[in-house]
Amino acid sequence: MRNSLVIPSRFCGPPGTGNGGYVCGRIAAYLDGPVTVTLRRPSPLATPMTVERDGAGSIRVLAGSLLIAEAAPSPGSPALRVLGLVSLAEARAVAGRGRYYADPFFPCCFVCGTGRQPGDGLRIFPGPVAGRSLWAAPWTPDPSVVNGSGRVRPEMVWAALDCPSGIAAAEAVGLPEDSAILLGQMTASLAALPAAGDQCRVIAWPDRRDGRKLTAGSALLGPGGQVLAAARAAWLTVPRPVPPPAVPDHPAVPPAAGHPAHTGRLPDPSRQITTQEQQQEEIRP
C-alpha cells in the first residue's frame, strides 16, 4: 500500500528542509506504539513523497527514487528513561541561556529557531540547569498545533522533543563553532497529549559520543510535572552551513515578540543537502 506525505514549508528545520522531529512524527503516524524513525536524507518541503509499507510492519518514505526515511515499530524497546525532573520555574529561569543561542546555526527552525514568531514556530529555547546534566525550556502549545479535540497533534510532540536533545548533546561535548548537528534517528513514546495553553516544559540530557555520532534523551512534562512523552535521538556532527544564515538578537529570556516572521523564503540549501545526504547515510538501525 502506498500513501502520499507532504511536509508544509512552515515546518522547516535546516534551510529548505523539514524539521527532523516533525518529519519523524509524521512518519510515525503510519505505525502504532513506540516507533523508531531513521532519516536517510533531508526531507523536502511542500513536495509529495511516497510512503511504502513492506508487509512486515516497516515503512519507507521516498521522494521520487530517493530514500528519505525508514521507520519500524519498537515494541520491545524498554521504557524510555527520564533523567530527573525540572520545575516550570527552573525551566523559565534557564530558557534561552544555552551557548547555542549566542550563534544558532538554524535560526529558521520551526522548533528552536529564534527567527520564528509566536504562533508560527514552537519557540522552545533550552538552557542548561545549573549543577545538573539537564537542559530545559518552557513550552505552552498554541492553538495552531492542536487537533480538533484541542490536544496537541502527535507530530508536534515529536518536534518538541527533537531540538532540545540536540542542543543538550552539542553543548555537552563543546561542539566547535564550525560544526552543526543533524538528526539521524529518533525513537519516541507518547503517553498523553497536552492541550493548547498547558504550561509544559521540555527537558533533555546528553548520553554519549561515538565519533561523530551524539546520542541524547528528552521528555515532555505536563503542567503538574507528569511525563507525557519521552524520546531518544542520535545526531550526527556535520560542517556548519556556509555562509551561515543571519541571526537575530536573542536575549537570555525569550521575549513574547520581536523576532521577524518566517516568510518561507529560505537560503539555497543545495550545498547543505549534499552534506546531509552523505552524513545521514551513516545512521543505521
What is the predicted function of each stretch?
Residues F11, P15-G18, V23-T50, D54-G55, ...:
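Hydrophobic beta-strand-centered segment that forms part of the acyl-chain substrate-binding groove
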Residues M1-S4, A56-R151, V253-I273, E281-P285:
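Non-catalytic linker/capping segments at the edges of enzyme domains
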Residues R123-A191:
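A mid-sequence, solvent-exposed acidic-amphipathic segment
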Residues A180-P254:
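Accessory, usually C-terminal, subdomains that scaffold auxiliary metal cofactors
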Residues R53-I59, R212-T215:
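A short, compositionally biased
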Residues S9-G13, V145-V146:
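Short hinge/gating elements
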Residues T36, S58-L62, G217-A219:
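Residue-level detector of beta-strand face positions
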